[in-house]
Amino acid sequence: MTRVALTSAVNLAKKLQEAGIRHPAVLKAISHTPRELFLDNALAHKAYENTALPIGQGQTISQPYIVARMTELLLQHQPQKVLEVGTGSGYQAAILAQLVPELCTIERIKGLQIQARQRLKRLDLHNVSFKYGDGWQGWPNRSPFDGIMVTAAAAKVPEALLSQLAEGGVLIIPVGEETQQLMRFTRRSDRFSSEVIETVKFVPLVNGELA
């Protein structure tokens, strides 16, 4: 990580702290992650702005505040094994991989998955398992998970993801179509409590179609 990138990442973490992010480990991970690595060169100058940016294939790299907020919500439950649905650029995975012992991540667009794998390897993050597949179905043979994070909006909550939560596990997911709410579901035996966190805007979670 260059000195310029490090300074920019540290400044981004400070902005997120001012915006309400409080978890010190999340802020540290943001400050140590070169966001420009996850963007095309043409957009690298915007890497440390607190905004979502296109990454091709109709997908985006999420706004840093949302990345940090979802991570903070997940870490409140001290997960040991986490599933990310929607690898995308790999930026969210890079943040999570610094904070949890084991990360599994699924992407339905092959080209994005290949790029993300290469980027995390460059960052020497080796506690990540990648899967090319339909995130709507989760990763049954690697379940149960202490935490599941979905980085695209589902019109309804996928039952498969709820079923793959461990006891006490949490699912962080944007739900809705035009109007979306970031929600947290917590498993207690065969029951699930839900909590609305805030209004968000994500690309849709596609069911079944691989690209």
From Swiss-Prot:
Which keywords does UniProt give here? Cytoplasm, Methyltransferase, S-adenosyl-L-methionine, Transferase
Q: What is its EC number?
A: 2.1.1.77
Tell me the Gene3D superfamilies matching this sequence: Vaccinia Virus protein VP39 (3.40.50.150)
Q: Which reaction does it catalyse?
A: [protein]-L-isoaspartate + S-adenosyl-L-methionine = [protein]-L-isoaspartate alpha-methyl ester + S-adenosyl-L-homocysteine
InterPro entries noted in UniProt: PCMT, SAM-dependent_MTases_sf
In terms of superkingdom, the source organism counts as Bacteria
Example of a GO cellular component annotation carried by this entry: cytoplasm
Q: Which GO terms describe its biological process?
A: methylation; protein modification process; protein repair
Molecular-function GO term, any one: protein-L-isoaspartate (D-aspartate) O-methyltransferase activity
Q: Which SUPFAM superfamilies match?
A: S-adenosyl-L-methionine-dependent methyltransferases
Q: Which residues form the active site?
A: S62
Compartments reported by the entry = Cytoplasm
Q: What task does this protein carry out?
A: Catalyzes the methyl esterification of L-isoaspartyl residues in peptides and proteins that result from spontaneous decomposition of normal L-aspartyl and L-asparaginyl residues. It plays a role in the repair and/or degradation of damaged proteins.
Q: Which family does it belong to?
A: Belongs to the methyltransferase superfamily. L-isoaspartyl/D-aspartyl protein methyltransferase family.
PANTHER family found in the cross-reference section = PROTEIN-L-ISOASPARTATE O-METHYLTRANSFERASE, PROTEIN-L-ISOASPARTATE(D-ASPARTATE) O-METHYLTRANSFERASE
NCBIfam families from the UniProt entry? pimt, PRK00312.1
**Protein name per UniProt:** Protein-L-isoaspartate O-methyltransferase
Question: Which lineage ranks, top first, belong to the organism behind this chain?
Answer: Bacteria, Pseudomonadati, Pseudomonadota, Gammaproteobacteria, Alteromonadales
Question: Gene encoding this polypeptide?
Answer: pcm
